[in-house]
Amino acid sequence: MFNEICIYEAKLNKLDEIEELMKEVAEFYLKQDGVIDVHYIKRTHRQKDFNAVKEGELPIRLTRNIGKVTYVLYWAMENEEVHARVGKLGIEKFYKRWNRCLTTMTKIILGENIV
């Protein structure tokens, strides 16, 4: 299995637009042959610190956003060929609308499963 993880920083005035776009992109990707799973995650919590994790404390809900909201894409597919083919289609279809919503370039991590 091949995976892409993207970290996005969205403009505060574009949150509704980007979340609607995420639904469109996920639906589009899931219809493509070789795509296994697509998840978009909105950062809503943080840990107080490492000791809080060791003590089993609950994460802290974020109550305000300063300048941006962070989202993560987890996208799983059969192999690199699927990634190349579907990624190209996605960029052709969604790039301009997507880019208008972001504060900075997307951070992208690509790789294969270990477990």
Question: What residues fall within each predicted segment?
Answer:
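Glycine-rich beta-strand-turn "strand-cap" elements at beta-sheet edges
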Residues: I36-I66, E92-V115
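Active-site-flanking beta-strand signature of metal-NTP-handling nucleotidyl enzymes
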Residues: F2-E9, V72-Y74
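Short, flexible turn/loop "capping" segments at secondary-structure junctions
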Residues: M1-F2, R64-K68
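Hydrophobic alpha-helical core bundles mediating ligand binding, dimerization, or RNAP-core interactions
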Residues: M22-V25, Y29
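Short beta-strand segments enriched in hydrophobic/aromatic residues
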Residues: A10, M22, K42-T44, M77, ...
